[in-house]
């Protein structure tokens, strides 16, 4: 059951490699690479990826493999194929994600052509993993000997298993003093039913056993690709990125046939036609070999104008031979699941910022962007993200780059409104939430998105974590003791809306950092959610409204009015701050009018002047009042939202 769910969940990755160009390689070097590939039969191709929980050593192991096969020079911890860390730190991406290697296996006296695809283990980028799986015959399931099986290990296992990949269990970090190899092997056998005898023990750091045991296992256990050279050419579009010199670059897996530079191809999904300008392998940079054939994973430069024409999962075919070519099953398009509003702060121009925001989004194909207008904050944008991590990474990036220039609202998830007349509406903005009258008369049910969360943790934190999940409206579905040593796996159905509220941070803090989390969409469920609004002198500030479960409304409402009061300076008239849900006021705070003492400097005798001044003050008040809540400095909104 989980396996089928796993297939359903498919995401785009959200960063683009900036690939160094390899035309620097001497033509003779490229010729010899070409010759070497030509001499290797498809039976000697091995396409695989490494899957693991974050920090279990994927990138380090990739480095060792690239060194041992002579792709890169040995020495140092380079993480040549790593991107997520850099992405997190600097919001940029530096390296290609896939690499071709040549390996001469002395046992057989033969050359092998190996494609390694490194994958980020994080949940929001699961699509990355599944897409790379689609071009692989197998995967190394890497487990840190000092940590054992963790949440992403489990989730990635299900995905790989569901895609029929041959899995090689690998225990890493056996050089560590506190490595508990026996325990890790136990967990792998108990959790995944992969026999202990099949496990390979390595140290990616020192390289121990990588050459001796791991490379031979890759050759012996991972099956070669199954395509057919004589069939019409077809390729699966696995990934794409934008290169400022050559434009759109596609990473493709050649399923059948052969394709060459200059060939004309067409896309099954868009029907558009292209002529291949450049073609080759990632080694580790773009290395133009002029040809790719069945079973290989490589790149093509199609002279494509827009990145959005590169549909992940698309099939490329030879122009004119579409009728005889079977289109590949492809992938499901990912849908944004977390949304925020962004608005220019005081004094910033929408127009100028619009270009910036659009540019930022352009680099990240998986972000959706729409115009939006707010009563308090004016014209802005609505941004959609794949998941809560994706949203927070991007939001951090916006804040770092546009800090004071943008006001960013609280994240929200989509809600499904089901009407009595049978139609449905998906809303991604609290502003679209049906009002009480509509709810009473027309709405049959409101649903919110749920996920199945997998958590692993040491038993001593079980109580804390269960409490946290209950507090976040979770429903326990499974509890499994991974082995005798006290590692537990918990499964909960949780509302995605709760996850967005820094659930991961809270989980880490109640487990002293030991618990790990992974999750997967499981669809929409009926829910008693309402819209909570913040009112200022009676009018609702739309950009601050939030949809939440009715059980949370009271607590959040009280906190809101209290907090907002802190940021409002006293005005010349009374300001009433209220929280309202379902047409009912939940909480209220008042800021007393500040009576500017305009009379202070006057002598008591100067009565006419005194009267005049009082009248003037009254008019001033009237003027401010007529402007109403807009008098609030936008800094206040910004401070309120930055909690
Ligand atoms: P990834 O997130 O799975 O790509 O993990 P990394 O390759 O970035 O490794 C995470 C951390 O573990 C880094 O600090 C590595 O240096 C360290 N590491 C990886 N493999 C080993 C190993 O075999 N032994 C030891 N002691 N540390 C390792
Ligand atoms: Mg890594």
Curated annotation (Swiss-Prot):
Residues 1-18 form a transit peptide. Transmembrane segments: none annotated. The keyword Protein biosynthesis applies. Keywords: GTP-binding, Hydrolase, Membrane, Mitochondrion, Mitochondrion inner membrane, Nucleotide-binding, Protein biosynthesis, Transit peptide. Its EC number is 3.6.5.-. GTP binds at residues 52-59, 118-122, 172-175. It is found in: Mitochondrion inner membrane. It is a peripheral membrane protein. It is an enzyme of class 3 (hydrolase). GO terms for molecular function: GTP binding; GTPase activity; mitochondrial ribosome binding. GO terms for cellular component: mitochondrial inner membrane; mitochondrial matrix. It catalyses: GTP + H2O = GDP + phosphate + H(+). Residues 43-226 form the tr-type G domain. Gene3D superfamilies: 3.30.70.240, Elongation factor 4, C-terminal domain, Elongation Factor G (Translational Gtpase), domain 3, P-loop containing nucleotide triphosphate hydrolases, Translation factors. It comes from the Eukaryota. GO terms for biological process: positive regulation of translation; translation. PANTHER family: TRANSLATION FACTOR GUF1, MITOCHONDRIAL (PTHR43512:SF7), TRANSLATION FACTOR GUF1-RELATED (PTHR43512). Promotes mitochondrial protein synthesis. May act as a fidelity factor of the translation reaction, by catalyzing a one-codon backward translocation of tRNAs on improperly translocated ribosomes. Binds to mitochondrial ribosomes in a GTP-dependent manner. Belongs to the TRAFAC class translation factor GTPase superfamily. Classic translation factor GTPase family. LepA subfamily. NCBIfam families: lepA, small_GTP. This is Translation factor GUF1, mitochondrial.
